[in-house]
Amino acid sequence: MLTTSKCNHNAYLMGYFRSGPGQTHKVEELHYAYSRDGLRWYELHDNKPVWTSSVGEGILRDPFIGRGPDGKWHLVYTIRPRGPYIGYATSEDLIQWTDERTLPVMMDIPDTVNSWAPEFSYDSIHDEFLIYWASSTGHDLSNSKHYCTRTKDWQTFTPTSMFYDPGFQTIDASLAEHEGKYYMAIKDESYVYEPLKYPHPPMNFLAVSNQLEGPYEVIPGIQTPDYTEGPEFLWVDGVKKWRLYYDYWAYGKFGVMESSDMKTWSSELAESQIRFPYRARHATMVPISEKELQRLIEKYALSVHYPTPTYSPVRIAAEESKGFLHEAFTMKSVRMEFLATTITGTQVLFDEGDHDNGLSMRIQDGLLEAIVCAKGMKLKIAGEHALLSLDEWSQAAVTYGEGTLCLYLNGTCVAEGHANINLVSNHDAAGGYGGRFGKDAFGDGDGKAALQGCIRNVRIYSVPLQAEDLKQMV
């Protein structure tokens, strides 16, 4: 994390690898999710890897991403086999990762067993990156301490030295600067190897220093719940608070606490307040620009784009049991531009599925309407009269996620509804845009109900786009 970490951002990226409870179902590669508030994180690329490491055994765990003063992104991560190396790569755009290699950070320390969960902070005073990680030396993993090195160019490094040793086993450190002080969240793992001497379960605690390099002193009375690890700080400018994220690795979930001053922390936020991708583990969170977020959404969440202007219904899915526009979903967005020559009657803009499981958007007697249905349960919303315009291009979008259905016109939300609906099940009806292709989600099946006008730039996304996203697209 940069020492100047309080930035005016409204977009955040999370990098993570995946596994189930207790290290099962492992997918040890780089994954992405994004958030607007730091609480609800939506997976990109359908929760599949966005980048795969080729060093060592091809394993990427505990990714940490940070931006340098030149705007370039740097990625460090845990690799296998165990030993004196960590993984490294750099990127201009968070999409193409280059210069992949191992960094021999513990090569000069005898009997190094492992080098785990590396992170770094940029030291603006010395124009250097401070890289820190946990290593154990000897015969096993029972004496992990934190070591560090410095670099200006990621090519040459200062001799490795001890960074933090509280006298017991620690891993998973993360640093942040707040009002001239440096705070460290770090996992106390002493119980794992010495349960009789340290009977309290593993958890994360906080320490503070006046200098980036330390020494750090423990802040009494602040810790995350039992059986947590992988702490990570993020400043969320919209609420002027720090969020501390941590991983219940054995239970397959995340927890979040928050503070405005790094001294007084909330209790753990309720699970209803947060959302994380399924099986996400040991994440890194970083603020990004609107331009960067939109590029990532277009790369990893855009399912299909139909740019050509059309004046009649376009079928994009046949009547069949599998394939595009037939798969179950919990999140989806459809965005299009249309020019209507009339707004009377029924004119279907988008038609997926049927009246049992489906999603649809239409013009109905001057109103813009949308509906989602799952196993026959329906959620229908409509905008107000006098919003639609004739003979000029407009942007319409419908978004769905976590039971919330939103309808947008020219980047402004005109209707929103919520129902106890999450999964829209597989559906085998034909579908498309600019008209109806069977019995639609509204329950109507009388003819094509074609748009009287033109449609162009139809885009379907695998995430529930938000108002800020759509405004960037207008």
Please name every model-derived segment.
Residues 1-308:
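Carbohydrate-active catalytic/glycan-binding domains of CAZyme proteins
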Residues 408-411, 416:
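Short strand-turn-strand beta-turns centered on an Asx-Gly dipeptide
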